[in-house]
Structures are given as structure tokens and as C-alpha cells.
């Protein structure tokens, strides 16, 4: 034990001395700032003394100018917003932007200094007049104004209630440690700056209250405003909040002073103070003393990193007690700000460590003070909900649950992935939870006390100094009695899946011989529990299992063996984690029917049932029951059937599918989906169609998961069976051969970008009577002047055509949909409202032209385009050539107004001029209007979730 502790003491003393000696090793920054309330500007005079603490001579310096990230459409911030389908900054007017206007840059001899901006426009490169030697300083004077943006893009800027939130608003030095670390503002809260001592002299309007994370040395009023002096020693950027009302309160606790505007309306103010005392006591016990004068814990900071989940529901259905919710909000925001303010990690590349410590301590807080807290809170006690497996989950079970939700979709990323390379879901939730869960997993393996002490040691020794993840790693390894290389190599630095199973169990009188299988080859420790009457009677850890390993344990009246019973390990699949020792029949999983949907229960075969109601004009309203096995976590094998009843046809209809999804890798060829689907509905009065389609689909994606580029290749064999009402007129098909089959190959390449969208679709179809190929290209461009241009090109050609009708022909304005792919509300209608439904496919025309040219049995070539006039009002135009066998090709065209309310989801097309002449002046104009509408719930859901994934 002595040999273990002694090195830690020595290293601790050395680090303490290092921190004492490095107090003076920092930059010096003095700011004189005036807030101009009328112009929403900051007038700044900055005196910066840059210390070259490297071993290299510097001829240039770099400063972060993140306030300039709002200056135009081409900044790194604007491009990041576009990747998330946000175009508010792109569409902003000039007076709605924020920027930095640098007036002068001079040295201490008052000589002008040359400077330039980076390509991202939020980093400034300063060319020194003379080289800066190691351990020497250079003084720079900068005069500039900062135009603040409205806070509709991010919380930064001003609100329409005359409130201001300023963070990362002035020039700060970039970090140089032998190389420059230059990071643009991408709204990731990860400014990387050097250790600085800052003095701020501030003048602001008399009608505002000011709050800051800096220490306020003095505040006084004068006839036209207020003046304050603030100080930040070894601080990062100064955060300022101005409000017309004083909404912040100060809580002086034994361990730190907190300024906060987070409140709970139904929780007494005295009790709130006691809760803050409890939170700060917990933080002090686990981290140690906070080194700054006060900690700012604001609602704005909380909103940037909230408690995701049910607490975001409207207040009238909040499921948690006010005390619990208040403490968790204070705890999460305080931990986030403490670690951000005091640990000088590289926040873009090493953010996972801050996330790990914060979320690990949040898990520990709930375990200590709220061990019985359920994930659904009070909702878990309500009849009709309490029977769900989700209602039985503890609050801390959300961490593996959320992480696995992303891992099951093949979207998890290594913890060391830079912030700006994470998809939004991982950046906001997934990787944060995985990081905290990882430390909790490690604590369960090596002992909670050792992880707790390592965190506290790391924080105390390295606060307010430059630090790396490797420093934390070395402290952990010295504390552990076991080898923990696996934690960093196979958990932190990897996205490999953890998945074990109990392969078999052999019983003897006094022992159990158990064979464990590592299904994915990720070598990490696995826990095994012995249960009797749902009570734990034994627990073991097994490590270094590369493929399979047989272990022997003593019998201790176990009835069941369960791997990872406490779910400390984020294991991919827990459905095969248990073995019953009671015989063959006792090991069979029972079937469990559950309403709607639920979390995964590994001890049952789950079937979910949900009432469904669909509509088309032939079946009318069709109520039914959907039966499926899709849990809240995605599963590889899914079954989904929806039998329904058509009241109009007085017959059963419905659909069903069997699907197996195999993820092959993270990038490149990343999935293969094998599927069999079928369905039956009516497509006219007393006329039914049935489909049976086996298919396989492959997907490709680039190494950059943030990219919206995807490629797909699918093969399917569509079999159509039709029963026709002989009393109805010809439905544009060969009534003597109502059944047909089509072999279809499709290749798609998509770049789903809000500024530059493009897609390419190649299609090949082979049937007994025809062979055809087609190509479709679509492009959308949002220009810098906010003008949007849309272009779609389509070309199709029959290689062989022995049909005697237009049922399989290329359509100019309304495809027949013989493969039953499209969501027509009335697919056989030739007149009436339902016939006006528009689906942009094949020719893509909007006007109904002469019947002779509405279909092509030879070849077709069309172009569809539109350009916006104002917001969602656009002009569209279509032109094309239609060629039928035995006839000359025909030039066709139309034009009109497009009301692009929600692209691809709800649009209206008002025709103006076409081959028919001026349609707007012709009778029955209302019958010529076309519309796009999406009523499918799954498709609509994609509109709101696309930015996350």
C-alpha cells in the first residue's frame, strides 16, 4: 500500500509547486468597454500583454474573435448552422448580424501592426513588428467595436426585452504549445484560450442590472449610466448578463458563492437555499475548493446544456418533485461551469473528460440522495403506465439507455472525436452520457473510492493550469490495482461494441462451469451476478476474454445468472445475458403484449400493439391494430404487421414486413437491410391490389458523420396481384393480365444540404413485357442574396416495350404508380380533388396537358425548375420532350406559382401558362391547382429529427 501511495504524494507536491510557480505565468488583459444600448454595440479599448511561455520565438500571434462569427453567410458558424438545417443566420438582414470592426492595432511604441482574418473570419492573425522571444512579453493596444446580433441564432447577443448575454465577446489569445490551436466558433461552447488575468472597466446603461462570472470590485452610478470594475484572475472569457430586472440572487455557502437566476416556483426560497448548500457541499466533497470568487449559474447556461428528457415537458405534466429537479438543474449547470472555468483542457478535442467528470458526479449524486428516483418520476406510479418496463427504470438508467439508442443506430462515435466532428445528438447527449457512464463502469470495476480520489486529485492539482487527458489517465492508472488500459484503448478511444453472452452452464453438486462468449471481440471486463428470488447472492468480474472462456464458480443457491445486471456497462445487447438454472422450460422467455411501445425487457419476448387508423378514398377509414416488436431501442430483426378493416369495402386490408438490418461498419458500406414486405388495399371500387416484395438495400456514408451525403443501392422484386371489378371502365391496364412482377434496381446518391442540395437517382426495371431505365437529378441552391433556385432533370427510355396500354408508361404529370410506392390518397382518380394531388416523379409537370402527351411509351426528357420571389413564394417552370412510338416528339411546357410552405411536406402549385394557354383565365381554375401533402407520421417525424442525426 505504501508503494502505491508514496508516488502519488510526491507527484501531488510537485504539481502543487508547479501551480504556485505558474501563477505569474499568464497573459495580462485590460479592457475599457462601453455598452451602447441604442446601437447594440460595444466600444472597446483593449491593452493586452502577451507572454510567450513557449520555447519558440514568435513572429505572429493569433486571437479568437468569436463575436465576428455572426458577420455573414460564409463564416464557420453559418456553415455549421447549415449542416443542422438552420438557415436563420444565412437569411439574416445586414442589421441583424453581429461583427467586429477593428479600428487600430498598435504596439507599445504606438507603431501600427498588420493583421488579417482567417478563412473562418473569427480568428485574427497579428504580425508582430519584432520577434517575441521565449519568456518575453509583447504589449498590444487594440481599439474596436463589436456589433451585437439578436439572440435568435444563439443565446449570445440582445433580446427584444432589452436583455444582453455576452460570452466570448472580446479578443482572447489562442493557445500556443509548440503549435497554434485555432478553432472557429461553431456554437459548441468550446473557446480555447490561454491563462489570463483580466481587468474590465465597464460603462453600461443606468436602467440595466449587471451579473458576471468575474469578481465585481466596484459598481457606481453617474448621471448617464453606471460604471463597474471587474476582475478575473486566471479566468477564461468574461461572461456578462444585463437585465432590466434584478433576477439574480447570491448564495454564500461554506465552500463557494453562487450567483443564480434558476428558481423553482413551487419550491420555497429557503428550501432552495438549503438545496444549493447541499449541492455545493457535494461538489466540494468530490472536487475540492473552487478557486474563483464566485460561480455564475444562469438559466441561459442551463438552457444550453439542459437535463434532456421528461423535465422538458410543459410544467403542468412535470414528472419530478420540485426539489429534485431544482437540485439537478443547479448541479448540472454548476459542474459544467466549474470544469469549464478551471480546467484548461483542449475543449474541442478533450471535452469528453469534462463531460465524464460532470456526468459521473451527477450519477453519484442521484445514487447518494435519490437512490429510488425513477426515470419517469411520478408518472411511474400512474395506472396504465406503471406496468411498462420504462416506468420501472431508475433515473440513472437513462445513461446507458440514451447512449445505446444511438449505438443501435450505428451513430455512436469515440469519446476522443473532436466536438466539431460529432453529430448533434452525440455532441449534446450521447457522448456526454457515454463518458459519465464510462467512469461509473470503471468505478464498479476498480472501486468507487479510487475513481473518486483520482478525480479529486486531478482537479486539485491541475486546476487553472494547462492540462491534458494523459494527466488524468496517469493518475487513474496509479490508483488502480488492476490493469485499466482497456478503459482507454477499448472504451474511450474506440467506438467498438461491447457485447457478451452466457453461452452455456454446466452444473455440478458444488459448482457451476460457465462458458462466456465475447460476441464482438471488444476486450473489457464483464460482471456476472447470481440471483435468487430477484436478490443478488453472488457477483464476479471476468476480464481478458477475447473470444470464449470457461470459468468455474461455487454454487450459492443461484436460480439465475445474469451478466451486467446493474447495467453499469453500456452493453449493446442484453437479451442473451441470462441463464436460468431451473431446467429447460424455465429458460424459455414468455410472450408479453404491451400497449404502444416500451423499453427493452431482456426477460420477455415483447410484442407491442397500437390502434391505427388510415384513409384512402376507396377503403375509407380503415381502423386496425398494429403488432410489432420494435422497442424504444432499435433491434436488428423487426416484424411489423397492421391488419385493418375497410368499412367502405367491408373487407380486411393491411400491410406487414419482416426486416433484418446488419450494420457492417461506421463508414463506407455501413449497412445491409434484408426485407420482405407485403400489403393489400383497394385502388378502386371493389378492386383490390396485393403486393409481395423481397428486397435488399445497401448504404454508404463518408467518414465525416456530420456530412449529409449518403449513397444507396437496392434490389427488389415487386409482385403485384390485382382483383378487378369487371363492371368498371378500363383502368389504363391490361385487364386480361392483372398480375405482374417487376425486378427493380435503384442507385441513389444524396447530399442533403440546406444550402446546396443535390441528389441523383438511377433506376432499372425489368418485367415480362418491358425493360426501362431512367435517371433523375435534383439540385437546390440558396444564394448569398437569399434567392433559392431549384432544378430537377428527368430522362427515361424503354429498351423494350410490348405493352398495349399506358399503365407502365412514363408519366408527364401524374405517375400511375404501378409499383405502389407513392402515398396517393386516390390513386385511380382522374377528376376531383384527389386527382390534383401532386407527387414529383417522372415528368414532374404540374399542368394537365393534352392526353396524347401525358404519357410516353418510348422516351421522355423533362426539366423542372423554380426560383423564389419572396420567402416561400416561388415561380416554377417545366419544359420537356415526350416521344411515343409512331409519333414525333412533342415539346411540352408549363409555368406557374409555387407556394413552398414546407419543402417536400406541404406545397401548392398554381398554374399560369402552358401548352393549354393562359390557364389562370380558363374555366374551372380550381381544378387545375395541384398540391403536395404528407400525412405519413414517420415522414413528418423526419422533418423534426433530421438535424440531430
Where in this protein do the model-derived segments appear?
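Outer-membrane beta-barrel initiation region
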Residues: 534, 542-543, 551-555, 564-669, ...
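Beta-strand-rich binding/interaction modules
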Residues: 211-212, 294-295, 451, 484-485, ...
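Extended, low-hydrophobicity, Ser/Thr/Pro/Gly-biased non-transmembrane segments
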Residues: 85-104, 110, 116-117, 122, ...
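Outer-membrane beta-barrel "beta-signal"
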Residues: 899, 903-904, 926-949
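Amphipathic alpha-helical substructures
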Residues: 291, 420-421, 425-508
Amino acid at each position: 500500500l505504501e508503494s502505491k501511495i508514496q508516488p502519488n504524494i510526491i507527484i501531488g507536491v510537485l504539481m502543487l509547486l508547479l501551480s504556485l510557480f505558474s501563477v505569474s505565468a499568464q497573459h495580462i488583459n485590460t479592457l475599457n468597454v462601453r455598452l451602447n444600448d441604442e446601437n447594440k454595440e460595444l466600444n472597446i479599448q483593449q491593452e493586452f500583454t502577451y507572454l510567450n511561455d513557449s520555447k519558440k520565438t514568435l513572429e505572429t500571434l493569433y486571437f479568437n474573435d468569436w463575436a465576428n462569427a455572426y458577420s455573414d453567410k460564409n463564416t464557420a458558424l453559418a456553415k455549421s448552422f447549415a449542416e443542422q438545417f438552420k438557415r436563420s443566420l444565412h437569411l439574416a438582414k445586414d442589421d441583424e448580424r453581429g461583427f467586429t470592426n477593428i479600428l487600430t492595432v498598435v504596439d507599445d511604441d504606438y507603431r501600427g501592426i498588420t493583421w488579417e482574418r482567417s478563412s473562418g473570419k473569427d480568428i485574427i492573425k497579428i504580425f508582430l513588428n519584432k520577434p517575441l522571444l521565449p519568456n518575453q512579453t509583447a504589449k498590444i493596444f487594440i481599439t474596436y467595436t463589436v456589433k451585437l446580433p439578436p439572440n435568435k441564432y444563439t443565446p449570445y447577443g440582445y433580446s427584444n426585452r432589452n436583455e444582453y448575454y455576452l460570452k466570448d465577446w472580446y479578443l482572447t489569445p489562442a493557445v500556443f504549445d509548440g503549435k497554434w490551436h485555432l478553432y472557429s466558433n461553431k456554437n459548441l461552447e468550446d473557446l480555447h484560450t490561454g491563462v489570463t488575468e483580466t481587468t474590465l472597466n465597464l460603462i453600461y446603461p443606468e436602467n440595466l442590472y449587471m451579473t458576471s462570472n468575474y469578481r465585481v470590485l466596484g459598481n457606481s452610478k453617474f448621471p448617464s449610466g453606471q460604471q463597474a470594475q471587474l476582475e478575473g484572475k486566471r479566468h477564461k472569457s468574461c461572461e456578462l448578463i444585463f437585465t432590466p430586472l434584478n433576477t439574480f440572487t447570491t448564495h454564500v455557502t461554506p465552500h463557494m458563492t453562487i450567483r443564480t437566476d434558476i428558481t423553482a416556483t413551487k419550491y420555497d426560497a429557503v428550501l432552495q437555499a438549503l438545496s444549493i448548500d447541499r449541492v455545493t457541499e457535494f461538489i466540494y466533497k468530490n472536487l475540492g475548493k473552487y478557486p474563483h470568487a464566485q460561480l455564475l449559474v444562469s438559466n441561459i447556461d442551463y438552457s444550453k446544456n439542459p437535463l434532456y428528457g421528461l423535465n422538458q415537458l410543459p410544467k403542468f405534466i412535470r414528472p419530478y418533485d420540485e426539489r429534485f429537479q431544482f437540485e439537478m438543474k443547479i448541479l448540472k449547470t454548476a459542474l459544467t461551469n466549474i470544469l469549464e472555468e478551471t480546467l484548461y483542457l483542449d475543449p474541442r478535442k478533450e471535452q469528453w473528460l469534462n463531460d465524464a467528470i460532470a456526468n459521473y458526479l451527477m450519477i453519484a449524486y442521484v445514487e447518494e440522495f435519490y437512490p429510488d428516483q425513477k426515470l419517469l418520476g411520478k408518472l411511474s406510479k400512474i395506472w396504465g403506465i406503471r406496468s411498462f418496463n420504462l416506468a420501472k427504470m431508475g433515473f440513472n438508467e437513462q445513461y446507458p439507455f440514451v447512449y445505446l439508442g444511438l449505438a443501435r443506430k450505428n451513430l455512436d462515435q469515440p469519446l476522443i472525436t473532436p466536438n466539431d466532428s460529432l453529430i448533434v445528438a452525440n455532441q449534446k447527449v450521447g457522448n456526454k452520457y457515454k463518458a459519465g457512464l464510462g467512469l461509473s463502469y470503471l468505478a464498479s470495476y476498480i472501486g468507487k473510492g479510487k475513481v473518486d480520489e483520482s478525480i479529486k486529485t486531478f482537479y486539485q492539482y491541475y486546476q487553472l493550469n494547462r492540462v491534458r487527458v494523459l494527466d488524468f489517465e496517469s493518475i487513474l492508472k496509479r490508483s488502480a490495482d488492476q490493469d485499466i488500459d482497456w478503459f482507454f484503448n477499448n472504451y474511450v478511444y474506440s467506438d467498438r461494441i461491447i457485447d457478451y453472452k452466457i453461452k452455456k452452464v454446466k452444473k455440478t453438486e458444488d459448482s457451476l462451469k460457465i462458458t462466456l462468449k465475447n460476441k464482438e471481440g471488444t476486450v473489457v471486463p464483464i460482471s456476472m451476478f447470481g440471483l435468487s428470488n430477484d436478490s443478488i447472492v453472488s457477483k464476479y468480474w471476468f476480464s481478458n476474454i477475447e473470444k470464449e472462456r470457461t470459468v468455474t464458480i461455487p454454487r450459492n443457491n443461484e436460480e439465475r445468472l445474469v451478466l451486467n445486471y446493474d447495467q453499469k456497462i453500456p452493453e449493446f445487447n442484453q437479451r442473451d445475458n441470462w441463464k436460468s438454472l431451473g431446467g429447460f422450460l424455465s429458460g424459455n422467455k414468455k410472450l408479453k403484449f404491451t400497449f404502444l411501445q416500451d423499453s427493452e425487457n431482456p426477460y420477455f419476448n415483447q410484442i407491442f400493439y397500437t390502434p391505427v387508423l388510415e384513409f384512402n378514398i376507396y377503403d375509407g377509414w380503415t381502423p386496425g391494430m398494429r403488432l410489432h416488436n420494435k422497442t424504444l431501442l432499435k433491434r436488428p430483426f423487426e416484424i411489423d404487421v397492421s391488419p385493418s378493416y375497410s368499412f367502405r369495402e367491408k373487407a380486411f386490408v393491411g400491410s406487414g414486413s419482416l426486416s433484418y438490418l446488419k450494420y457492417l461498419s461506421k463508414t463506407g458500406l455501413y449497412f445491409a437491410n434484408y426485407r420482405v414486405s407485403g400489403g393489400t388495399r383497394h385502388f378502386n371500387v371493389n378492386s383490390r391490389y396485393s403486393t409481395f416484395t423481397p428486397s435488399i438495400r445497401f448504404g454508404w456514408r463518408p467518414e465525416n458523420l456530420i456530412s449529409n451525403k449518403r449513397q444507396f443501392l437496392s434490389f427488389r422484386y415487386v409482385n403485384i396481384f390485382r382483383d378487378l371489378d369487371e363492371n368498371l371502365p378500363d383502368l389504363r391496364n391490361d385487364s386480361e393480365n392483372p398480375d405482374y412482377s417487376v425486378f427493380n434496381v435503384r442507385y441513389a446518391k444524396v447530399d442533403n444540404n440546406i444550402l446546396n442540395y443535390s441528389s441523383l437517382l438511377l433506376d432499372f426495371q425489368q418485367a415480362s413485357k418491358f425493360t426501362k431505365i431512367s435517371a433523375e437529378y435534383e439540385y437546390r441552391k440558396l444564394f448569398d442574396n437569399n434567392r433559392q433556385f431549384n432544378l430537377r432533370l428527368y430522362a427515361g427510355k424503354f429498351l423494350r416495350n410490348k405493352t398495349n396500354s399506358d399503365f407502365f408508361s412514363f408519366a408527364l404529370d401524374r405517375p400511375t404508380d404501378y409499383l405502389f410506392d407513392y402515398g396517393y390518397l386516390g390513386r385511380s382518380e382522374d377528376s376531383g380533388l384527389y386527382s390534383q394531388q401532386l407527387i414529383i416523379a417522372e415528368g414532374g409537370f404540374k399542368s394537365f396537358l393534352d392526353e396524347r402527351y401525358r404519357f410516353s411509351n418510348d422516351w421522355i426528357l423533362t426539366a423542372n425548375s423554380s426560383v423564389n420571389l419572396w420567402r416561400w413564394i416561388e415561380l416554377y417552370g417545366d419544359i420537356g420532350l415526350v416521344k411515343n412510338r409512331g409519333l414525333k416528339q412533342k415539346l411540352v411546357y408549363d409555368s406557374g406559382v409555387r407556394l413552398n410552405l414546407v419543402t417536400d411536406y406541404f406545397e401548392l402549385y398554381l398554374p399560369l401558362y402552358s401548352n393549354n394557354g393562359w390557364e389562370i383565365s380558363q374555366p374551372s381554375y380550381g381544378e387545375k391547382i395541384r398540391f403536395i401533402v404528407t400525412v405519413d407520421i414517420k415522414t413528418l417525424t423526419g422533418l423534426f429529427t433530421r438535424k440531430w442525426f
